[in-house]
């Protein structure tokens, strides 16, 4: 596919742009390191099978190729800190169905709480929500890979 399926969602529903602007401010204070936000976004892109999200995160990353290449196998990779592992585990729990029980167990939350303050956990939750907001637009609207939403959907 060479062009998006939907040229500009905001022209059909202007509140889409307002919501996008609001959710994009979730980490504007820099509570979480940009590198962590990129790793989480990259993992979500991989989990939902979105070339757009995966390429976007890789394009914004200022990390080593080894770490970026190992995100899908973070559990067995030596490249990630315990805090990053906790964030990636939360990311997978939130974005992967669990037919046998709750997605975020008490044990998983407790592990994350060892590495993040309550504020950081709320911001991480917001980052996951921000990404979650854009997933349907990326999967249904099929934006061009390597081009930002804003750049291609300004019509």
Which positions does each model-derived feature cover?
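A ubiquitous short alpha-helical element
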Residues: 2-11, 73-80, 90-97
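Short acidic alpha-helix initiation/capping motifs at coil-to-helix transition points
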Residues: 14-20, 49-51, 98-106
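Acidic, glycine/proline-rich low-complexity segments that act as flexible tails and inter-domain linkers
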Residues: 1-38, 58-62, 66, 145-155
């Amino acid at each position: 596919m060479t062009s998006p399926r939907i040229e500009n969602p905001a022209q059909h529903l202007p509140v889409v742009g307002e919501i996008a602007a609001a959710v994009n401010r979730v980490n504007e204070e820099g509570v979480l390191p940009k590198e962590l936000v990129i790793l989480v976004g990259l993992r979500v892109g991989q989990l939902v099978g979105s070339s757009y999200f995966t390429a976007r995160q890789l394009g914004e990353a200022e990390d080593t190729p080894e770490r970026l290449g190992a995100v899908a196998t973070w559990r067995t990779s030596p490249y990630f800190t315990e805090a990053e592992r906790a964030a990636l585990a939360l990311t997978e729990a939130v974005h992967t169905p669990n037919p046998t029980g709750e997605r975020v167990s008490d044990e998983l939350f407790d592990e994350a709480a060892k590495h993040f303050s309550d504020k950081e956990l709320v911001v991480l939750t917001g980052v996951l929500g921000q990404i979650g907001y854009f997933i349907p637009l990326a999967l249904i609207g099929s934006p061009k890979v390597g081009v930002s939403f804003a750049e291609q959907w300004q019509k």
